[in-house]
Amino acid sequence: MVKHQAQKKGVKRKQLKNIPSGIVHVKATFNNTIVSITDPAGNTISWASAGKVGYSGSRKSSAFAATVAAQDAAKIAMNSGLKEVEVCLKGTGAGRESAVRALIAAGLVVSVIRDETPVPHNGCRPRKRRRV
C-alpha cells in the first residue's frame, strides 16, 4: 500500500538576496493603493497594499494607508539588500505623494520618479459623475 504525502499548506518562497537597485510600482486608485517592489528584470521582491496592511472600506483610499503600505513593502525589500529605487507612479489616488515620501523616510534612495498614468485617447466611456 502506497502512502500519499500530504501537500504542504505554505508554498516555500524563493529568497532574493543582495539586490542593490530596483523599481517601485505605485498604483494609486480611488479605492486602494498597491505598492510593488521589483528588481530591474521585473521579478517581484515584495508588495503591499492598503488592504493587506489591515485597512478596509473607505480607509483603504486614505493617504495614511498608502504610507503604511509603502513602509511595509520597503522594509521587506530592504531585508534583501535593496538600497536605490526608481519610482513608477500610476493612477490619481490620494496615496501617490505619501507613498513616495514613505519610501524616502524608510531609507531608500529614490533616483527617478516616473509618472506612467494611463491616459485614454477617447477609449472607454467614463463612469457617471457624482451628484452630491
UniProtKB/Swiss-Prot annotation:
One of its GO terms (molecular function) is structural constituent of ribosome. One of its GO terms (cellular component) is ribonucleoprotein complex. It comes from the Bacteria. Keywords: Ribonucleoprotein, Ribosomal protein, RNA-binding, rRNA-binding. PROSITE patterns: RIBOSOMAL_S11. SUPFAM superfamilies: Translational machinery components. The keyword GTP-binding does not apply. GO terms for biological process: translation. Part of the 30S ribosomal subunit. Interacts with proteins S7 and S18. Binds to IF-3. NCBIfam families: PRK05309.1, uS11_bact. PANTHER family: 40S RIBOSOMAL PROTEIN S14/30S RIBOSOMAL PROTEIN S11. Located on the platform of the 30S subunit, it bridges several disparate RNA helices of the 16S rRNA. Forms part of the Shine-Dalgarno cleft in the 70S ribosome. Belongs to the universal ribosomal protein uS11 family. This is Small ribosomal subunit protein uS11. The lineage of its organism: Bacteria, Pseudomonadati, Chlamydiota, Chlamydiia, Chlamydiales. The gene is rpsK.
